[in-house]
Amino acid sequence: MKVFILALLALAATTAIAQLETTCSQGFGQSQQQQQPGQRQLLEQMKPCVAFLQQKCSPLRMPFLQTQVEQLSSCQIVQYQCCQQLAQIPERTRCHAIHIVVEAIIQQQSQQQWQEPQQQAQHKSMRMLLENLSLMCNIYVPVQCQQQQQLGQQQQQQLQEQLTPCTTFLQQQCSPVTVPFPQIPVDQPTSCQNVQHQCCRQLSQIPEQFRCQAIHNVAEAIRQQQPQQQWQGMYQPQQPAQLESIRMSLQALRSMCSIYIPVQCPAPTTYNIPLVATYTGGAC
């Protein structure tokens, strides 16, 4: 009996995905033809996630089931398939896979729904769905995977200058101030605390979609100030320690600043070091 029920649920889930596949083939049109084979394969692999996020699966009513038997809905089956597919995708590729899912959903929406000011609400809703997906699947899914916009050289230089306090703080080039009068019951801020405050203030002024690039600029600035031999080659013994130090500093920065900083940033294009892909649970 249970086998029959599970088969029925799987059939319902497959039907939902098949309906989605028809919609996708009609909705994508020319853009689907322009996709590379790897992107098409990812889209096929992520169709359960598209179906689940759009809630195109509907709960099945089975009154004949006993109350102690969990009544799985077709949505739960599709959710399971989605999580299973996500778990099979390498961590460094999940951000790209999620972009494809979001793009598929956007292209299936009517164009007017994605015009301002509705667009901002739609993206916020999508981000919340992806955060829930990360919790439900119990695997690492980037909280925010925003396509890294290409910034001009002048803009990148401005970002780097803006985040000079962060570079200083992460390198701990600020030294605590010696307080000659410890009896004064007023907290004497250290120079590091002042620089930390400046760093957080600068980060908060940078738009969310550019913070990942800004953080990479900070990491690049720190890298360039390290002895050159420590950064040569992809698998030098010194390199993991350097990257781990930066990763831990950025995690601390994320907590101290109390602002949104992407948990995972796309691999930087300015140098050959995969800050994310090298480490499990990758953070910037």
From Swiss-Prot:
Keywords: Disulfide bond, Seed storage protein, Signal, Storage protein. The keyword Protein transport does not apply. GO terms for molecular function: nutrient reservoir activity. Residues 1-18 form the signal peptide. Contains disulfide bonds. InterPro entries: Bifun_inhib/LTP/seed_sf, Bifunc_inhib/LTP/seed_store, Glia_glutenin. It holds the Pfam family Gliadin. Seed storage protein. Might be integrated via inter-chain disulfide bonds within the glutenin polymer. Belongs to the prolamin family. This is Avenin-like b6. It comes from Triticum aestivum. The lineage of its organism: Eukaryota, Viridiplantae, Streptophyta, Embryophyta, Tracheophyta.
